[in-house]
Curated annotation (Swiss-Prot):
Organism, as annotated: Shewanella baltica (strain OS185)
Protein name per Swiss-Prot or TrEMBL: Fatty acid oxidation complex subunit alpha
EC number: 4.2.1.17, 5.1.2.3, 5.3.3.8, 1.1.1.35
Biochemical pathway: Lipid metabolism; fatty acid beta-oxidation
Site (Important for catalytic activity): E119, E139
């Protein structure tokens, strides 16, 4: 053994080829500080052994290296620039040491080689992947750029255009695609991987392959004619900005770094990367996006833990077909859990099956599935008009019409057809789980399971704990949601649960602006372009449906009359009473049609303005800051109330619920990250300016205390 540490082992193989194996404790290899220090020490040991003629890098895991240890990032990025620069330079010195070894090097890549893992393989002369490999630099998704030489080496290996696409999108690349652009030299079967890498090194040692020429190319400036370079980078800037926009600076910074470094050798090029990396690491956007990544890991970790208490779900059922039932059936079946789709009407079953078939056909058309897989998934969906079909179901999801009496009747019926230990969940967005539980003989095996529409696109599922729901029930539904590919958050029962409870105060702020003559299209523009929502409040209400919004608003008003009760008519009432239901009937705040390419199109409709003018008078302009404050303050305070009341368990789960359930702008990180970034005291001062607008603008006592103590919701 040449070198051994808890994360890396180096041994000498036949023909004096050294093998460096990444073997960290745990299921995957990460590039944390310990691994980086071990790699540095291992390379020193390798350099001192004069017998070594070549080096192969391998992994003992199913993956090569999944990337840096992101849990270290927020603490590290909070350090002074000088400390951060020192860390980046030390890390890069290790990668340079690997690249500068006096003999050929190769990486044998299986599974993921992402971020720092990808930058490791780029520092070797040859890269051999097996068919399971996925390679990429996802750093721009975290609001930063590669910091271990990725922006320098990748363009010199695969060309500027390809590197720009890889880095600015942050997408993983399959082994075959990596081979096409020259990121890897060969793709082999998993069992042949190490032998293929070693053979390539033998050929290099025997001078059949020119490893030094390959290395020199990475150490030099990019060989790109001036005009071609100018066109390439100008085009990239336009395309990247069109996708990333002004709120996500990292992709544009990556283009700029690659352009500036293109005429430099390695040392100068790395310095350009370092400076840009440090600048981005200090941004609020990086903190927000890294926070989302960590919150996602936290929520998934809780779901994994819940799996230990969960009843195994091998068969499921959904009651109520149609679009929602079909979406749930598709999601369950496509992730491997057979499901019965039960309804009382054949046309509804047909609609549900057609919905599943449509979603599967779209997957096949995009090349993400095959007709054989589609057939297998459809065979996992059993339509039935008879309750007898659900008797072996481990979990039954009730998804009938959103009406308390109908749901209660169906829930009482279904209990008589399933096993004693079957779990029943209601897919409801507004009806109290405790109320519905009254119709159950065994309320302990009942909870809420709120899917968001469209089911196949929306990643969030709210699992609602009733006062009688058992831990096994909650754990089982959380585990089933995870198995379906969803991100579950557990919330306690209250009107609107978590997501709708915090959404409707936002709509109330919007209604307040319109009642004073606000222009709904102007408000949407501010909330989309400046705050960063995917849809402004008027557009979102049209998508949700004004009938749905009208009903949910009434539920919220009844549940929280002191804050959400309303006197008189508001804009939602105006649209609903005039049968303007939104996208579903082609007219709401906006009017909807189909363009010449068959794509849905929305336009401002003078009729909407006329109706609102009749109700609220002439239009009045509001400043952008005023629009943002009046819509967001109620949502933020209600989110804080949910945390304080224990409706949601943590800031992390609340923020994930907002990002995944409502499309809260990821670059802001969620309400609690937004509050920490703004400063709780600054938010309290802002909210107090609007306190005269009513109960939704009243800051809680606990918030005031936190503000007075200069506290924050996250510890990092």
């Amino acid at each position: 053994m040449i070198y051994q540490s808890p994360t890396i082992q180096v041994e000498l193989l036949e023909d004096n080829i050294a093998k460096l194996c990444f073997n960290a404790p745990g299921s995957v290899n990460k590039f944390d500080r310990e691994t980086l220090a071990s790699l540095d020490a291992a390379l020193d040991s390798i350099k001192q052994d004069s017998n070594i003629k070549a080096l192969v890098l391998t992994s003992s895991k199913d993956t090569f290296i999944v990337g840096a240890d992101i849990t270290e990032f927020l603490g590290l990025f909070a350090q002074d620039d000088a400390v951060l620069l020192s860390w980046v330079e030390q890390a890069n010195a290790v990668f340079n040491k690997l690249e500068d070894l006096p003999f050929p090097t190769a990486s044998a890549i299986k599974g993921f080689a992402l971020g720092g893992g990808c930058e490791t393989i780029l520092a070797t002369d040859f890269r051999i992947a097996d068919t399971t490999a996925k390679i990429g630099l996802p750093e721009t998704k975290l609001g930063i750029i590669p910091g271990f030489g990725g922006t320098v080496r990748l363009p010199r290996v695969i060309g500027a255009d390809n590197a720009l696409e890889w880095i600015t999108t942050g997408k993983d690349q399959r082994a075959e695609d990596a081979l096409k652009v020259g990121a890897v030299d060969s793709v082999v079967a998993p069992q042949a991987l190490e032998a293929a890498a070693i053979q390539m090194l033998k050929d290099a040692v025997a001078e059949k392959l020119d490893w030094q020429a390959r290395r020199n190319r990475k150490l030099s400036a990019l060989t790109l004619p001036k005009l071609e370079a100018m066109m390439s980078f100008t085009t990239a800037k336009g395309m990247v900005f069109a996708v990333a926009g002004k709120h996500y600076p990292a992709p544009m910074a990556a283009v700029s770094v690659i352009e500036q470094a293109s005429t430099k050798g390695r040392a100068e090029a790395l310095q350009i990367e370092h400076q840009a990396f440090i600048k981005l690491a200090k941004t609020d956007v990086a903190k927000a996006l890294i926070g989302i990544f960590l919150n996602d890991q936290f929520v998934k970790g809780k779901a994994k833990k819940a799996g230990k208490l969960a009843k195994e779900v091998n068969n499921a059922a959904v009651l109520g077909a149609g679009i929602m039932g079909g979406g749930i059936a598709y999601q369950s079946a496509s992730k491997g859990t057979p499901i019965v789709m039960k309804d009382i009407a054949q046309p509804a079953l047909d609609l549900g099956l057609n919905e599943a078939a449509k979603l599967l056909s779209a997957q096949v058309a995009r090349g993400r599935s095959t007709p054989e897989k589609m057939a297998k998934v459809l065979n996992n969906i059993t339509p039935s008009l008879d309750y007898a079909a659900i008797k072996h179901s481990d979990v039954v999801v009730e998804a009938v019409v959103e009406h308390p009496k109908i749901k209660a009747q169906v829930l009482a019926e279904v209990e008589g057809y399933v096993s004693e230990d079957a779990i029943i969940a209601s897919n409801t967005s507004t009806i109290s789980i405790n109320l519905l539980a009254k119709s159950m003989k065994k309320p302990e095996r009942f909870c809420g399971m709120h899917f968001f529409n469209p089911v196949h696109k929306m990643p969030l599922v709210e699992v609602i704990r009733g006062e009688h729901s058992s831990e096994e029930t909650i754990a089982s539904v959380v585990a089933y949601a995870s198995k379906m590919g969803k991100t579950p958050i557990v919330v306690n029962d209250c009107p609107g649960f978590f997501v709708n409870r915090v959404l409707f105060p936002y709509f109330a702020g919007f209604n307040g602006l319109l009642a004073e003559g606000g222009d709904f299209a102007a408000i949407d523009k501010v909330m989309e372009k400046q705050f960063g929502w995917p849809m402004g409040p008027a557009y979102l209400l049209d998508v949700v449906g004004l009938d749905t919004g009208h009903h949910a608003q009434a539920v919220m008003a009844e549940g929280f009359p002191d804050r959400m009760g309303k006197s008189g008519t508001d804009a939602i009432d105006v649209m609903f009473e005039n049968k303007r239901l939104g996208q579903k009937n082609g007219k709401g705040f906006y009017v909807y049609s189909v363009d010449s390419r068959g794509k849905p199109k929305k336009d401002v409709d003078p009729t909407s303005y006329g109706l609102l003018k009749d109700a609220f008078g002439e239009l009045k302009a509001f400043e952008a800051d005023d629009i943002i404050a009046r819509t967001m303050i109620p949502m933020i305070i209600e989110t804080v109330r949910c945390l304080e009341e224990g409706i949601v368990a943590s800031p992390a789960e609340a923020d994930m619920g907002l990002v995944y359930g409502l499309g809260f702008p990821p670059f802001r990180g969620g309400v609690f990250r937004y509050l920490d970034t703004m400063g709780v005291a600054n938010f309290v001062a802002l909210a107090d300016k609007y306190a005269h607008l009513g109960g939704l603008y009243q800051v809680t006592d606990a918030m005031r205390t936190l503000a007075a103590n200069n506290g924050s919701y996250y510890q990092a």
